[in-house]
């Protein structure tokens, strides 16, 4: 493979979808090819995520500036990787990890290392005149089933809902584009239903509606009504998913939500009953990230019926994923590149999940940009699932639109596993 020498590295401060600063990195190669990547930011974060370096200068952006991360890229990182081969991704990422030297990227910042890592991959792909998804992965390409967030709650919205995300999964579609079409129709029907009931149709951080409804079951009933109003059914076209973000309402050893206090055992039973009542096939962060016994009990009780996704539990970290596999906690891993800080480590987490029979779901963050790298990672890795928000807000739609472009470019080679095979 021809060497693709890095000639320049540049970073700048830009804004994410919440109006807070984030870092954007540009890499240029000696042949003139360039790569640009912008890094997202989370609101609901796991305690063991790689560190997002912020300036803590209250005089700028309420302390959330990222000039220190920009300086990391333009200084120590640039000095080390200029002259290196952009086509050797693992070597670049190894340098980034070693330069930082901490367990959680706290010296340089995971926002700095990820920006560089992704921009390097994009520059190399552009140099080879190859789409990023082809550059990152070989073989058959599977389009992901989208987990589309239509109602927001928790820390992603200013309403009374304790659960963070209520999602539809278009498992009955035959193509990705059809999945987006029928989901958009449900989204617009949901808007109409909310309006008729006198609810606000304002949207939350991830583009889903944020009506001031008070219960999980009311949210689920509204979604089912919207599916049926759009001319579809839960039996043939859609299933439901939840991101509970249980760590956000775990306090003093109990789960406090909807005016109740439940033990781990009681919460597991609550989920069991909810799954029996509604067509829910995926539940994310159902237990607090440190409630290992709760996770084990949940997995025993529901692991053969429902996709149980660990986000805060695993934070895209191979050591934590390995522990979860060994102790039989959850059966799926949410993959967020900025939780770990490099592309190589992201793919290692995906591979570890797959090799051990766990599913992997590529995910955005609540603070996003127009960057579409995760769309390419989803296709390149053949994960089969992606979580990137609702069907509003251009920062979310950018990912869906990019996936439709990828599907179009693949033509007949684009595979979308529908129906019961969605978990393949």
From Swiss-Prot:
Cofactor comment: Binds a second Mg(2+) ion via substrate during catalysis.
Major localization listed first in the record, in broad terms: cytoplasm
EC numbers on record: 4.2.1.11
A Gene Ontology term for the protein's cellular component: cell surface
GO molecular function, one term: phosphopyruvate hydratase activity
Reaction(s) catalysed (UniProt annotation): (2R)-2-phosphoglycerate = phosphoenolpyruvate + H2O
Pfam families, per database record: Enolase_C, Enolase_N
Cofactor dependence: Mg(2+)
Record-level GO BP terms: glycolytic process
Active site, renumbered: 206 (proton donor), 336 (proton acceptor)
Keywords, ordered alphabetically: Cytoplasm, Glycolysis, Lyase, Magnesium, Metal-binding, Secreted
Domain of life: Bacteria
Residues binding (2R)-2-phosphoglycerate, per UniProt: 164, 336, 365-366, 387
Pathway: Carbohydrate degradation; glycolysis; pyruvate from D-glyceraldehyde 3-phosphate: step 4/5
Cell location: Cytoplasm; Secreted; Cell surface
Enzyme class: lyase
Binding positions (Mg(2+)): 243, 284, 311
Purpose: Catalyzes the reversible conversion of 2-phosphoglycerate (2-PG) into phosphoenolpyruvate (PEP). It is essential for the degradation of carbohydrates via glycolysis.
Family, per entry: Belongs to the enolase family.
Listed name of the protein: Enolase
Species the sequence originates in: Wolbachia pipientis subsp. Culex pipiens (strain wPip)
Gene for this chain: eno
């Amino acid at each position: 493979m021809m060497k693709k020498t890095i000639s320049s590295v540049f970073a700048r401060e830009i804004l994410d979808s919440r109006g807070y600063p984030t870092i954007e990195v540009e890499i240029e190669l000696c042949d003139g090819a360039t790569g640009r990547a912008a890094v997202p930011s989370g609101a609901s974060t796991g305690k063991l995520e790689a560190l997002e370096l912020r300036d803590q200068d209250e005089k700028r952006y309420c302390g959330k500036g990222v000039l220190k991360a920009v300086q990391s890229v333009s200084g120590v990182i640039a000095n080390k990787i200029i002259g290196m081969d952009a086509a050797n991704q693992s070597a670049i990422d190894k340098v980034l990890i070693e330069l930082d030297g901490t367990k959680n990227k706290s010296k340089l910042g995971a926002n700095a290392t990820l920006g560089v890592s992704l921009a390097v991959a994009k520059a190399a792909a552009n140099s080879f005149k190859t789409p990023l998804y082809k550059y990152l992965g070989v073989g058959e390409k599977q389009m992901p089933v989208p987990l589309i967030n239509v109602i927001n709650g928790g820390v992603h919205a200013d309403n009374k809902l304790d659960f963070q995300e209520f999602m539809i999964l278009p498992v009955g579609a035959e193509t990705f584009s059809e999945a987006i079409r029928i989901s958009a129709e449900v989204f617009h029907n949901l808007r109409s239903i909310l309006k008729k009931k006198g609810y606000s149709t304002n949207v939350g951080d991830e583009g889903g509606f944020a009506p001031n409804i008070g219960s999980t079951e009311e949210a689920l009933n509204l979604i089912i009504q919207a599916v049926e109003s759009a001319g579809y059914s839960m039996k043939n076209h859609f299933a439901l998913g939840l991101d509970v973000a249980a760590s956000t309402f775990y306090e003093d050893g109990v789960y406090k939500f909807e005016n109740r206090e439940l033990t781990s055992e009681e919460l597991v039973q609550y989920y069991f009953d909810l799954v029996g009542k509604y067509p829910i096939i995926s539940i994310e962060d159902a237990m607090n990230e440190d409630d290992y016994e709760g996770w084990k009990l949940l997995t025993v009780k529901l692991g053969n019926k429902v996709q149980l996704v660990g986000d805060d539990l695993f934070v895209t970290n191979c050591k934590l994923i390995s522990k979860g596999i060994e102790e039989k906690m959850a059966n799926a891993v949410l993959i967020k590149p900025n939780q770990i800080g490099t592309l190589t480590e992201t793919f290692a987490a995906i591979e570890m999940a797959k090799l051990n029979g766990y599913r992997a779901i590529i995910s955005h963050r609540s603070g996003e940009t127009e960057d579409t790298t995760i769309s390419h990672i989803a296709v390149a890795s053949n994960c089969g699932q992606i979580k990137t928000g609702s069907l509003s807000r251009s920062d979310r739609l950018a990912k869906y639109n990019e996936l439709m472009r990828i599907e179009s470019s693949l033509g007949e080679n684009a595979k979308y596993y529908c129906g019961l095979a969605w978990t393949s």
